[in-house]
Amino acid sequence: MLACLACAPAMADETVSIGGSRAVLINPKAPRASVILMPGADGNIRPGDQGDIHGLTGNQLVRTRHAYAARGLAVLVVDAGTDLTSAVQYMAAIKRPVTVIGTSLGTIRAAQGIARGARPDALVLTSGFLSMESGSSQNVMSILGSPSSLPRTLVIHHSQDSCRATLPAGVEPFVKWSAGRARAVWVSGGLNEGDPCQAGGHHGFNGLDGQVVGIAAGFH
């Protein structure tokens, strides 16, 4: 058993600096692609010195970061202040294609980064602030204005997400607006515990991590 573990490729988490902002990198041997994970809430992951994360540890993207790496992806977990253009360039130097994956308020920050010129190869929006129908006047559509800068986009949404700013009703208007650039995948089931806008609810895909990672990791 120990010999087998010793044969497994090491995937050490490390803290890196991108444009003066700290982020956490997990770089497996010979990655097949790269992902940039943009957590929700305030986005402050509070990276330590050795690739450790002290903030938003329950967030769906933070808690599943190693699952993405286990699927052969180079993973960068960014802090709220990380410049997305710089992050995309950093990961492109490791392995393209580069997919940005944002969840909840992270979808707002992803859209803001794209509006400022970031050009990932693909975008995954989970539990997203997508359109006015999502429940928030600030959303991906309002930030981008036009779908022309939208890369190939996958929306992953829980059919029973009851968070007031990411309602399921917001998905179809966004997909229609995207002019063929976006498609949606719905998930259901899992657990719904606590605040409907937090990680323990359907909004945070509680109990569905493996399914969500599998869908997102396959889109690049």
Segments predicted by a language model, with ranges:
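Residue in the alpha/beta-hydrolase core beta-strand immediately N-terminal to the catalytic nucleophile
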Residues: P97-V100, A122-V124
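Gly/Ala-rich beta-loop-alpha elbow adjacent to hydrolase catalytic centers
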Residues: I101-A110
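A fold-wide structural signal in alpha/beta-hydrolase
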Residues: S34, A69-L76
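C-terminal catalytic histidine-bearing segment of alpha/beta-hydrolase fold enzymes
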Residues: R181-H220
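Alpha/beta-hydrolase active-site loop
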Residues: N59-T64, V77-K95, Q112
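The feature captures the conserved acid-bearing segment of alpha/beta-hydrolase catalytic domains
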Residues: S127-G189
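N-terminal cap/lid segment of alpha/beta-hydrolase-fold proteins
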Residues: M11-A30
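Short, surface-exposed "cap/lid" segments of acyl-processing enzymes
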Residues: P28-A67
